[in-house]
């Protein structure tokens, strides 16, 4: 019995690695982490989206590739090996899985299709459910969210926020709302964005 990646998974992984080797050298990564390579980062993001990464886990019926977590793991390995400054886990793994399993049919049609078409991008704020921090907390009441979240993942370039309260109830917030304040958190990893 064979326990490795399939030919399709290897092919997808190799395409991602090849793209990153060509467009995301360590010199490019260094410029991006020093705040000088905004256009370079946009080119990397655009190129990876053109490879179909945004629709990897979105079901085919909503315009995605309908692949599985093993494909996502293979892509994640390539992104990690190349120190890619690319928001992947939150917007293109966690969000499609949460929306596929926890949203209404109307929400699936709207949000999953928009992810596959690269019209929206989700940041993830699940720390309240996973490991609440002092001074943080969110509540849902009357279709409104109130509170403060720490360590929101992948907020840079995001249009929406997928967040959870301490009980695991998940909500969606449009980041264009004027009542939202985003504070960038400084961490050791300069290739990822975290916020409050």
What are these language model-derived features?
Residues 1-8:
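Intrinsic disorder at enzyme termini
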Residues 14:
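Conserved "HGTGT" condensation-loop signature of ketosynthase/thiolase-family condensing enzymes
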Residues 28-36:
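C-terminal helix-coil-helix/basic helical segment that borders enzyme active sites and/or dimer interfaces
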Residues 39-53:
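Active-site-flanking structural segment that lines cofactor/substrate pockets
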Residues 49-109, 117, 154-158:
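Internal helix-loop-helix
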Residues 113-196:
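FAD-binding core of flavoproteins
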